[in-house]
Amino acid sequence: MLIVVSPAKTLDYESPLATEKFTQPELIEYSKELIDVCRKLTPADVASLMKVSDKIADLNVGRFQEWSETFTTENSRQAILAFKGDVYTGLEAETLSDADFEYAQKHLRMLSGLYGLLKPLDLMQPYRLEMGTKLANDKGSNLYQFWGNVITDKLNEAIAEQGDNVLINLASNEYFKAVKPKNLDAQVITPIFKDCKNGQYKVISFYAKKARGMMARYIIENRIESVADLTKFDTAGYYFVEEESTPTDLVFKREEQN
């Protein structure tokens, strides 16, 4: 079972590291091409392109300039510990054991606008470049065209290495659009998390993102190998709803949170 998740805009390069083990990202040549494009952008360009404040634009122009082809523990940290958005609040990677990290290294991948596909312990320099960014490049007008089949091919390598043909899609639509499911050597299973609000069950972004992280952790901690076992996910009050699910979409619900 291979899990894919989205990255996060919020980053943490300050907290103590939960592991000293690390690996090198495998698509740095592609990242370098994108950095070369990004280095030509002014702060005003970045603010407009990414729809961010001048302060965040300045920060990321600086990051593009400082980015190095050499990844060290001085300028980088492991991706799974650097990302700190809602998904990663649910994942709580900082409390995983060494054995969990080892398992995650084989069974978890993070999609990324700049790095393409990251293993949990891959070193990552700080950046902001969301997959949906309309960044013109030599391969097209956006990052989906830039990455083409590269991410899908890398996922197929990971699928082959980990032993079965099930991919659990815990990524957002923006990021999973960078994957070509028809070219994947796997069945794609997409969990859907619905929370009760005012008597109605619906996908609430904040809760759904956190639930994706919690499910990733559940798979890692429990070494889940089958979809049947995945339906037993019950973290934080979620429960599987068979009658609303299909073979490819697993619906989980939760009662209203106070």
Curated annotation (Swiss-Prot):
GO biological process, one term: response to hydroperoxide
Top-level taxon in the UniProt lineage: Bacteria
Family annotation (InterPro entries): YaaA (IPR005583)
GO CC aspect terms: cytosol
Protein family according to the UniProt entry: Belongs to the UPF0246 family.
UniProt name for this protein: UPF0246 protein VP0504
Organism of provenance: Vibrio parahaemolyticus serotype O3:K6 (strain RIMD 2210633)
